[in-house]
A protein has these predicted regions:
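Acidic/His- and Gly-rich active-site-bordering loop/insert found
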Residues: 2-95
Length: 95
């Protein structure tokens, strides 16, 4: 499993998601949408039933249901991350 996770993250960092400070769109570059769409497809392949991409801002939302018995109270967990990289440094060729 560790190797699968490592390979998945290496695939993500290889996507050039450099942002553009001069842009007035969200996300600031089309390249960032490539990663968003990749994440949506991977989550769906993993069996996550509720996955969507916000077409206006490029946000990816996924709801992973609890595998705990019905009615068992457990804390809610959220993952939040940027999909873009700094406009100051190229995002191309990352390995």
């Amino acid at each position: 499993m560790k190797e699968r996770v490592t390979q998945r993250f290496l695939k993500y960092v290889a996507v050039d998601t450099q942002s553009d400070e001069a842009s007035d769109t969200f996300p600031s570059t089309e390249k960032q949408k490539v990663l968003a769409k990749m994440l949506v497809e991977e989550l769906r392949r993993m069996g996550v039933p509720q996955v969507e991409i916000d077409e206006q801002y490029g946000y990816v939302y996924a709801k992973i249901l609890s595998n705990r018995p019905d009615g068992e109270k457990v804390p809610v967990l959220g993952f939040i991350a940027h999909m873009d990289t700094s406009p100051e440094v190229s995002g191309a060729g990352v390995k």
